[in-house]
Structure formats: structure tokens, C-alpha cells
Design a protein with these regions (language model features):
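Extreme N-terminal starter segment of soluble prokaryotic enzymes
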Residues: 2-7
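Short, glycine-/small- and polar/acidic-enriched structural segments
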Residues: 10-145, 152
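Short, surface-exposed acidic
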Residues: 131-136, 271-272, 311-318
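Pocket-lining segment of extracytoplasmic ligand-binding domains
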Residues: 147-259
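Secondary-structure end/capping motifs
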Residues: 227, 232-306
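Conserved C-terminal helix/tail region of periplasmic/extracytoplasmic solute-binding proteins
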Residues: 305-330
Length: 330
């Protein structure tokens, strides 16, 4: 029997390494893997038919569902997750130490609709500061960091408007010069890792702040998922289901290795213990059987609406409904 080809593009995150190395079987499927770098380019190639499935922004995917776009079938495969309290930056001499202190401040960002910056604003809102409580400044982070082009179908502007930096002006320079008070970005400034760097994280004890968010809300934010073209999913549902099982198996191999060795960082063993203690309901990062994953789906839909990213709130039950229908039809 001939194999069904499935062209998949995603980044080589550690838990996906077994799949990239060929250590996971995909019965009936000729899985052709592409190592993604620029996900906006990857998304364009997905929509143009260059890939059958790819890593996509969870926020932009959910925005599409909210607007009635069913061109993609999302898998409940949360391949990139993490908190974003850590992604707020200020000058090293700034008096700001908590997100609630951002009220009335000038805040810069290089992307409004990325999932990461959406979760950064969710963290800010969780602290009691609403979107319209700050003065937003949009612009390019630095000459070395490319700014993503706006996507008319999924991108929007801040409620209440925003100032735009002129061409040739950059957010990191504006922060250093005192023109803005803080920035949030997915691209961590290199100065953060220098003792004498110009910038520091706004939330100094971000692990404690993120742990508190997790305790109160019950989930770890999801950033990227896997999605397939609807035409491919409907033509080859078994191939998509085989991919889903392969992703789970890749994670299981990685997790077993991580627990056994735990040597990739000095206290990795402690991190493993924390994962087992506090995040058991979120491992593996697949499926909606987990209460934490259902809370995540509901929260992102609510947050998008309250941030003004969509005119109507998406039904969280619809985010992965198409994939669930494929699975149930087996």
C-alpha cells in the first residue's frame, strides 16, 4: 500500500527532536519534515499549499475561528507553551517592579497580534491594568530584529489607538532614552543577560508571579499549535491522526529521557520535580481531556474578546471541533 505524503513545517523544539531524528513511526504516512524558522513565512507556504500542516500562532488561529474562518483544522497540540510575565522589560534604573505599576505609562511593543504579546497583555490585565490604561507605542524593536507585517485577516490595533515610531526609530532606543517606560516583546533583549546591561525584566521574581498566575487560573499559556489545511485533513484524516499520535510519542520519548538524565541545566532535576508536582494535568501537552487545556481554550477566547482582538468571542468548543470530528469518525 502506498504511503500518504504529509509535508509538515515546525521548529525543532526539544520534545520534537525524536520525531525529527526519525525515532517515531508514522504508519501509512510519508512524513516530510521542514525545520521552520520564520513562522510567518511558514504560514504563507501553508496557505499556498507548500505544506500540508505547520506550526501556527494559537492566537491568530483562534482569531480566525472567531471570525468564521475554517480553512485550517487545528490539532490540540500545544507544542510551545509558557508564561509571559517574564517578557516585560524596563531600564535597569526603572522604579517599576510590578505589572500593576504600568497604569498610565507609555508601553512599547513590536507586535500586537502575536500569541506571546497577547499573553503578556493578559498578564498585565490580570494584575489590574486594562489595555486602555496605558499609552501604547508600536514599532520595530531594533535594526537587528525584523518586524512582522500586519495580517489584515487576523491583525488589529489597540483599543484606544496607539502611537507609531517613525521609520529609523526603535523601541529599545526609546526605552533607553526614557521616551517609553516599558516594552513587551517575544524577542528577549540581549542586555537582559548582561550584568551591566541597559535593561532588566520588569517583574524581577517572575517565577513567583507566573506560579501565582498558574495557581489561580489553572493552566500554562499556549503559544503555538499544529494546524493542517482543511482540504488535506478531509482528504487524509488517517494521516493527520497518525501525525497527532506521533507528536505524542515524540513527547513521551523526550520526557522519559529528561527524567532519566536531567542534566541539560544545573538543577534540571528540580524542574522535573516541579513539572510532576504542579503541571501533571498538562502533560503531555496534547488533547482536551485535561481540565487545564480546556481552561486554556476558554481563557484565550475570553481574553481575545476583552482585548478587542475580535468583534465576537469565539466558542472554545469550536477551536478543535473539526479535528475531534475526524477522530470520532475513525
Amino acid at each position: 500500500m502506498s504511503l500518504v505524503e504529509l509535508r509538515l513545517s515546525m521548529r525543532t523544539y526539544d520534545h520534537l527532536t525524536p520525531l525529527f531524528l526519525g525515532n517515531v513511526e508514522t504508519p501509512g504516512v510519508n512524513l516530510v519534515l521542514d525545520q521552520a524558522s520564520d513562522l510567518m513565512v511558514t504560514n504563507d507556504r501553508l496557505m499556498d499549499g507548500g505544506f500540508h500542516a505547520a506550526e501556527v500562532s494559537f492566537n491568530r488561529y483562534a482569531i480566525g475561528i472567531a471570525k468564521g474562518d475554517d480553512s485550517l483544522v487545528g490539532l490540540p497540540a500545544f507544542i510551545l507553551r509558557n508564561f509571559r510575565h517574564r517578557c516585560w522589560y524596563v531600564r535597569r534604573d526603572s522604579p517599576l517592579t510590578e505589572l500593576k505599576e504600568l497604569k498610565g505609562k507609555r508601553v512599547g511593543t513590536d507586535s500586537w497580534n502575536d500569541t506571546g504579546t497577547m499573553w503578556s497583555r493578559a498578564a498585565m490585565r490580570d494584575s489590574g491594568v486594562d489595555i486602555t490604561d496605558v499609552k501604547w507605542v508600536l514599532g520595530k524593536l531594533s535594526p537587528a530584529v525584523a518586524q512582522k507585517a500586519a495580517r489584515p485577516g487576523t491583525d488589529s490595533l489597540p483599543k484606544g489607538g496607539a502611537e507609531r515610531l517613525a521609520d529609523g526609530h526603535y523601541l529599545l532606543d526609546a526605552l533607553a532614552n526614557g521616551e517609553i517606560d516599558a516594552i513587551t516583546t517575544a524577542a528577549t533583549p540581549e542586555d537582559i543577560y548582561k550584568e551591566d546591561g541597559r535593561f532588566r525584566r520588569l517583574v524581577v521574581d517572575y517565577p513567583a508571579a507566573e506560579a501565582d498566575f498558574h495557581k489561580r487560573n489553572g493552566f500554562r499559556p499556549g503559544l503555538h499549535i499544529i494546524a493542517a489545511r482543511k482540504d488535506y485533513a478531509e482528504a487524509h484524516p488517517e494521516a493527520l491522526l497518525a501525525l497527532y499520535e506521533a507528536l505524542k510519542e515524540s513527547w513521551a520519548i523526550w520526557w522519559a529521557k529528561t527524567k532519566r538524565f536531567a542534566d541539560s541545566a544545573p538543577w534540571m532535576a528540580k524542574q522535573v520535580e516541579i513539572m510532576l508536582r504542579d503541571f501533571a494535568d498538562e502533560m503531555p501537552p496534547y488533547g482536551l481531556e485535561s481540565e487545564a487545556h480546556r481552561k486554556l481554550a476558554a481563557y484565550i477566547c475570553k481574553e481575545q474578546f476583552e482585548q478587542g482582538l475580535v468583534p465576537e468571542q469565539a466558542d472554545p468548543g469550536l477551536l478543535f471541533k473539526a479535528f475531534q470530528n475526524l477522530a470520532h469518525a475513525r
